[in-house]
From Swiss-Prot:
The chain crosses the membrane at residues 55-75, 88-108, 132-152, 162-182, 224-244. It is a multi-pass membrane protein. It catalyses: methanethiol + S-adenosyl-L-methionine = dimethyl sulfide + S-adenosyl-L-homocysteine + H(+). It is an enzyme of class 2 (transferase). The gene is mddA1. Belongs to the nurim family. Gene3D superfamilies: 1.20.120.1630. Keywords: Membrane, Methyltransferase, S-adenosyl-L-methionine, Transferase, Transmembrane, Transmembrane helix. Catalyzes the methylation of methanethiol (MeSH) to yield dimethylsulphide (DMS). It is found in: Membrane. This is Methanethiol S-methyltransferase 1.
Length: 285
């Protein structure tokens, strides 16, 4: 049956089922709840998802370029090519470029910075933003890098030279493999924006040591070190890059492990005592 319902100065007709009666304000509220706010939320989630994909693609192009840059393969500008300058100027510029990357990469990874940063950047895109900024700082380094062409060593034996190139490439393979072992897409932000898009809650981090992580604590960093140092031709510029990045890796490990101890406590302390930092099968000190 239909009954008149008084709403302000107007009389409305509302169909009632049994003894349940909906006021016009309740109807308005229900209509509103599936209206622009929900639609807008979905749009923003989709935009965040596209942003995460874009950041990942920039990273992917950057890491591929990094392989060519270090190994001197395919890419138009490598570690040994570019604008010729004085040695002092080249060293200063290159050190500043590496320092910029190191500061960005380390500061934005710290929990204190993340807590402050996520006041302005949505949590689901925090990791993608970090990945994007790191990629852009590396692209700047590749673009502005100054060569130092003085040869430190050059392997003349063709077989040994090929072996070193193969070892360097194996280092890059180790980097990629290690990221997939621990969840490549979470490490580079795609997992977070995908979960946000479908409305899935983020799961609390769990400490795990799959495959390579049973032998070394930081196989990704080990892969980078191998890739940077296994060079049949080592110029002064390549040596500067390899040496500074290796030093930064050890600094980064110290900062990262401090955060991991804060997060996992004794579980990570025991892992640190049991497993070597970088050298497989060597007991940790």
């Amino acid at each position: 049956m239909e009954r008149p319902i008084r709403h302000g100065a107007k009389t409305k007709q509302c169909r009632c089922l049994g003894t349940t009666e909906l006021s016009m304000s309740q109807i308005d509220h229900q209509v509103h709840s599936i209206g622009p706010e929900v639609t807008g939320s979905r749009i923003f989630k989709f935009i965040a998802f596209l942003y995460g994909i874009a950041a990942y693609l920039v990273f992917f192009v950057t890491i591929l370029y990094a392989i060519g840059f270090v190994m001197g393969l395919v890419v138009p500008k490598t570690i040994d090519t570019g604008t010729d300058t004085s040695t002092a100027e080249a060293v200063i510029i290159n050190l500043l470029l590496m320092a910029l990357f190191a500061v960005q990469h380390s500061v934005m990874a710290r929990q204190r910075f993340k807590t402050w940063w996520t006041q302005f950047v949505s949590k689901p895109i925090e990791r993608s933003t970090y990945v994007l900024f790191a990629s852009l700082s590396l692209l700047l380094l590749f673009w502005q890098w100054r060569p130092l062409p003085t040869v430190i060593w050059e392997v003349e034996d063709p077989d040994l030279a090929v072996t070193l190139v193969t070892v360097s490439f194996a280092g890059w393979v180790l980097v990629f493999t290690s990221t997939f072992i621990i969840n490549h897409f979470e490490l580079f932000g795609l997992h977070q924006v995908t979960n946000h898009l479908v409305g899935k809650e983020a799961t609390p981090p769990r400490f795990k040591t799959p495959l390579l992580y049973k032998f070394v604590r930081h196989p990704i960093y080990l892969g980078f070190i191998v890739a940077f140092w296994a060079a049949p031709v080592m110029t002064a510029g390549h040596l500067l890059f390899a040496a500074v990045t290796t030093i930064y890796i050890f600094v980064g490990i110290a900062l990262e492990e401090r955060d991991l101890i804060d997060l996992f406590g004794d579980e990570y302390r025991q892992y640190k005592q049991r497993v070597s930092m970088l050298i497989p099968w060597r007991r940790s000190v």
